[in-house]
């Protein structure tokens, strides 16, 4: 019987640190639900002490997720651990993940401390975390550059203090696979109480070998792998979980371990993370890239036609990628659309059927035929924009030509009021953005604009993703339409709604803080 490798996802904590715009609480919950559906064992969803917004997000996810263990990060600082526990306590069970640097460089230059003092602090903080939960994980930051004898001392002390998972991070992506395996083997040889904890690894991709390091560590005895979907994360990214999961599945003959992941959900989860985080997946990305199962060489094509196993070590279907595309038309009823969504793996709670069917009919009238990729794009936008909107695009028109200055006229619902404005710009998109910004009075700077076709052919849906800077904060917006200018307008309206909602959340947090202060004064 093979042993289980625990899959620890840190997309919402370490992965989010790489994003140009922070995710909203709703977007984080959307990703958390996708990860739960995929079957991750543990999800690290934030760093609660970092901001009131992160605290609220962690609390919301902890209250909602039932089938994965929710975890929050805390430094070896009393307040960090106490705040993490406060955010997580709404969950039936939770994990606190605390960490401190252990390498000579970090101890000397960052902490300005000694190894003995680091061990003392680690022990105290692990014990403090154990006051809140028996599921405590301890990480030795920069373990890859920590002498193994020093590392063994820290690990033994942390286990004695009550840590049930010990994480060995290659924080800067420095070690080679054979080195990293040697570190894990060295700990098993040196730490007498190592059988009382699960050894975990957390690798970074600075040298392009994060997945290789994680797999080498598993082969050496590690039984938890930490990473992020699509490998997102700081600098060159984290270990790509989908790659580790499928490597373990495909090479079970030599790995002799398994995961409890529903691998048929990998494709959908990957797409969800990519779209919400506004991080496109490279075509040649292993497992989930659009070219991962493509064969262009004539020799390869011939071999695949004769037997797929000639050139495919796994199938698209094994990760939930259905390559058989069915089409629907405006004559297709609600039942047909609902049935197709179910066949693609969607549940009723994943989308609003009324809104989706309305958008489907409008698209079918324009395109004639609506394909699976169209439905998935509509469902994604439907989910992104289902919250109450303060701003709504009512009407727009654009006049533009090769030698004319572009002029846009826009009508926008701002709360209960309909406003109209016209503006010139350097092209139709800029003209529309000038008009919208005049209407709302928001001072935003466009820092990123991406256009991607969702589907094939000249009538494909165009998805526009934008990132804007507003008073030092970055916000993401998305729009979808067969018309690129309309997609662009919708993306700007979406981003302005996100800014408005963020301001409302900030007001609510301030109100709660003021009420708490008033209650203290009353007592």
Swiss-Prot record:
Alphabetical keyword list: Amino-acid biosynthesis, Branched-chain amino acid biosynthesis, Cytoplasm, Leucine biosynthesis, Manganese, Metal-binding, Transferase
Coarse class of the protein's main subcellular location: cytoplasm
Any one GO BP annotation for this protein: L-leucine biosynthetic process
Protein name: 2-isopropylmalate synthase
Family label: Belongs to the alpha-IPM synthase/homocitrate synthase family. LeuA type 1 subfamily.
Example of a GO MF term: acetyl-CoA C-acetyltransferase activity
Subcellular locations according to the entry: Cytoplasm
Main enzyme class: transferase
Documented EC number(s): 2.3.3.13
Reaction(s) catalysed (UniProt annotation): 3-methyl-2-oxobutanoate + acetyl-CoA + H2O = (2S)-2-isopropylmalate + CoA + H(+)
Domain of life: Bacteria
Quaternary structure (record): Homodimer.
Function recorded in the entry: Catalyzes the condensation of the acetyl group of acetyl-CoA with 3-methyl-2-oxobutanoate (2-ketoisovalerate) to form 3-carboxy-3-hydroxy-4-methylpentanoate (2-isopropylmalate).
A Pfam family matched in the record: HMGL-like
Binding locations of Mn(2+): 14, 202, 204, 238
SUPFAM superfamilies with a match to the protein in the record: 2-isopropylmalate synthase LeuA, allosteric (dimerisation) domain (SSF110921), Aldolase (SSF51569)
Pathway of action: Amino-acid biosynthesis; L-leucine biosynthesis; L-leucine from 3-methyl-2-oxobutanoate: step 1/4
Organism: Salmonella agona (strain SL483)
InterPro entries, alphabetized: 2-IPM_HCS-like, 2-isopropylmalate_synth_dimer, AIPM/Hcit_synth_CS, Aldolase_TIM, LeuA/HCS_post-cat, LeuA_allosteric_dom_sf, LeuA_bact_synth, PYR_CT
Region (Regulatory domain): 392-523
A single cellular component GO annotation: cytosol
Pyruvate carboxyltransferase domain residues: 5-267
